[in-house]
């Protein structure tokens, strides 16, 4: 069995069906302080107290944190200062309980490393025979994409090894590259035992003779030209310290983290693994599912390391998390084309035949003189020729719509392919598809220069026949194009083969793929731990497996194969306040999903309702639905100014966009509170249209399926579904379902020492704001040559609380793609503050911001953003200076938290930690306080906690208060009466970012985006040749579209539900 099949194959199995319970035993040593107390180093340093332990071991570990890589910005907080939230006062909130948890993290022993590690700058330059030079570490613009990046990484590692072997005199005669760690970019790390010289510059040239034939085959892929050479330049940089007084400085600690990462990565830098920022995947094996004919789901892992401060001594933690990702299969492009067309037409394909049933060749008896090449795999065909012919006829007859072609174009864009007629070429001839062209091989012509120098108009079909002696079998299919600097190359699909190792982008995932990525292949905690351990030992070669040569050379080892174990807090949930001051208290021992008959605390008042029915089978039931809706809403206290028989009810076709817009515009003129859309499917295209017009025109809408609407007409059953609809409807109409309150006691346990004081301090005159980003694929740009905007912008979702923390408003806006800095903050903060002032009649004295982040590299940037927020507040009103609390939320952190002992046969809720589990990470060396919190209760799979980092704390709330407020806010989500993974403002901001992205996609379908492009180009015609024009056009384009699409956003209302 393949290793990844063994590691990840349990993901779909029954809990505990084949696995054995891991041997675990708790430490018998009593501990009063699990984290210990940080001390300054002294000449007579006592052995540090164990801050973590591992099951079955009493070995001391390290102090305390498991964050990601440190940022090197010197403007960050002093690592030795007192953490921002660390006030020496009694905790305001008491835990409901404490218990032991294990993490997906392991201790590394770095105490035996050389005290100094030399850093060598390694710069490889590709030199063509014509003198052109390309520095590989900077990347080559024409050499992008998943496949090319993997080839470049492997080639650079081979360049490093060849260079190392050419220069043994630099390493005290050593010829084994294992003594050095190369980061596959431009830095080499070597212990001072093997390298202790200072070089200003050392130059070496490598040619084909320095590599074996197999190595050169890989290296030559990045040159694309024969005769290329490589110039290697090195020089030394200041060393890095593994211990001593300089080891824990901000810059040294950051670089030491990179060293440990590079050392542990060395065994992965080969053809056996695909390394991406999102994870590492084996090239062979690890296939856990195949959603369709041309895609598969592969399992992999993510490894991160961190240097932490243990009583003044640097120590290391390694985190290993399992992951999965969809990939394209190694197939012909024609098979991919037919599979996508089958999905788009929902027909299951054209007429079926067998592989041998090919069409008769043109040319009759002369066919033997032509190359009978049939597929990318040396004569084997992987597509159905009759199906291809079927779609070719549909394309000829113009029965393939522009919408289908556009969807197909999006699926093909960015795909790396190998032209099979060039597969034997020594140079790398792979191409990246830019788009699908409506022209065919017969219709597209170009001027070809003949041997006698004359020019002749030649079709693509004629060219391949004359140049490659190949007659195209499907000359009437659309062509694919690949963009070069100043022109496009055209290729027939039948001559394209998809290269392996390419991930599928989120925007290209089908419903089936998304289903496999979420629920179907979820692993339980017991399986997750076993998988992580196997990755640790089998792939990373740690533990008792065969020696890891790089780890041995640097004298780095794993302290124990058992993961880190520590104490966790069990936080108490808030009270929920319904109508008539009715309080609903939760007992965490019974779960946090609450069922209550309490009426809405602030029921909405509805002026009128418009119902648009898109299901012709439901026409006769619309009146009954309206009566049932009014009845159930009235039971919750909602008021209607008009009777259901006076509501406007209209029947439209399931794809009538124009009619939908007309009805919504009329609803706005008539002051209608809400527009209902009843559709047969549960997730139709009309849903996106309704939500698009909701934000663009400014009218609240809600879409339900006919099945859901039918439940409103019954006397019995469907209560949960009805409740969910009404809970969503009430906030959209301006009401509030319930409020959250600070609890005094839970289950006869006092959980807050002074609830009235905490209520006044934490919630009165406090506004909570959430920022979320939705990034797309490649970076956006304005293509001047095509006069069009290429790519999708990043969408920022912003949610803000009003007078009460459970009352939310929000909006979204666009900015440059892949830009992680929040733009236009002063303007956006003004919107938030204005909404709070309008609902409360005063401005907030405290502003709490939950800002999404991806790691410690974001911290200095967030500090700068806070300064913009403060400037916006000062501009709001003279003398206005609210206190800011800014928390970075890292939802994609690879930290996991499990119970110390797991019942391997238990269900997901039994194997996971409970809602409210909080690991209090003590003051870390970077000076920011952190905690890890699990709010949700997973019904399947393994819970994914969120890491919170306190960046700014002007209001001086204690960490205990911040942890509890964060947990309480998760319960303020109004629709599902159970907490999601993050606070309500973050959850709402996340939904707003998704909604904004979907609205942009819908906008591109309904509006001719070229109109924007030409307007923007004409506006900046006078600077069209300047170097800054691309950025200027791109920013102007995004701002124009953002203002057009979001101008009528409904303020101060939960419209996105």
UniProtKB/Swiss-Prot annotation:
Report the residue ranges that make up the Piwi domain in this protein.
Answer: 677-1001
Q: Where is the PAZ domain?
A: 387-500
Q: By its UniProt entry, which PROSITE patterns does this protein fall under?
A: PAZ (PS50821), PIWI (PS50822)
Pfam families for the chain: HRDE1_NRDE3_N, PAZ, Piwi
Q: Spell out the Basic and acidic residues composition-biased ranges.
A: 67-81, 356-388
Using the record, list the residue span of the signal peptide; answer none if the entry has no such feature.
none
Q: Where in the cell is it found?
A: Cytoplasm; Nucleus
State the CDD domains in the record. Answer: PAZ_argonaute_like, Piwi-like
Q: Name one GO cellular component term.
A: RISC complex
GO molecular function annotation: miRNA binding; RNA endonuclease activity; single-stranded RNA binding; siRNA binding
Q: Where is the composition biased (Low complexity)?
A: 17-30
* Phenotype for residue 82 to A: No nuclear localization
**Keyword terms:** Cytoplasm, Nucleus, RNA-mediated gene silencing
Q: What is the effect of changing residue 463 to A?
A: Fails to interact with siRNAs and localizes predominantly to the cytoplasm
The record's section on PANTHER family has:
EUKARYOTIC TRANSLATION INITIATION FACTOR 2C
Report the protein's function: Transports small interfering RNAs (siRNAs) from the cytoplasm to the nucleus. Required for RNA interference (RNAi) in nuclei. Required for exogenous RNAi-induced H3K27 methylation.
Q: What is this protein called?
A: Nuclear RNAi defective-3 protein
Q: Tell me what gene encodes this.
A: nrde-3
